[in-house]
């Protein structure tokens, strides 16, 4: 500590000197890449959440969250975030898998191309009909033997939560 000599008469006054903590907002891409740079600022001050969008193969970026599993507070680019009083806060990238719907012509040809979308999202079944010599196309089904759910072109199909959904041509 420093030494302070009191004056011979009167009162000596000491003044406290304070410095505001510099704190950090970090971004964790959770398997992605291209995350924003960390942001620093004064403790308890507001910063704008970065609009830089990370990428991850086979996933769609859905935003940032204060908890890795997405159970915290959601943030998007441009939102205001209040920095902590000390240390570092982290925002975690949130991802939705991109899944596919494929069409199996079961011996036919000219089937529609695969469709992709976010997990559990709706897509419209293609109106493109495959052909097969000597057969009439009856529609699509989720089971090869026709025992699943029937779909016709233009119907709404909900993509699976992961992997690939397949519709089989029925003849």
Region locations from a protein language model:
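Secondary-structure capping and domain/repeat boundary segments
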Residues: 1-171
């Amino acid at each position: 500590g420093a030494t302070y000599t009191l004056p011979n008469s009167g009162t000596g006054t000491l003044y406290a000197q304070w410095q505001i903590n510099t704190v950090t907002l970090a971004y964790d891409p959770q398997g992605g890449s291209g995350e924003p740079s960390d942001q620093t600022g004064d403790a308890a001050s507001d910063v704008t959440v970065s609009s830089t969008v990370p990428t991850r193969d086979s996933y769609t970026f859905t935003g940032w969250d204060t908890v890795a599993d997405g159970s915290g507070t959601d943030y998007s680019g441009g939102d205001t975030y209040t920095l902590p009083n000390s240390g570092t806060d982290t925002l975690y990238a949130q991802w939705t898998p991109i899944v596919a719907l494929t069409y199996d012509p079961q011996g036919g040809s000219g089937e529609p191309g695969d469709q992709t979308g976010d997990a559990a999202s709706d897509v419209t079944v293609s109106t493109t009909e495959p052909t097969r010599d000597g057969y009439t196309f009856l529609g699509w089904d989720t089971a090869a033997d026709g025992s699943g759910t029937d779909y016709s072109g233009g119907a709404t199909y909900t993509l699976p939560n992961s992997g690939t959904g397949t519709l089989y041509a029925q003849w």
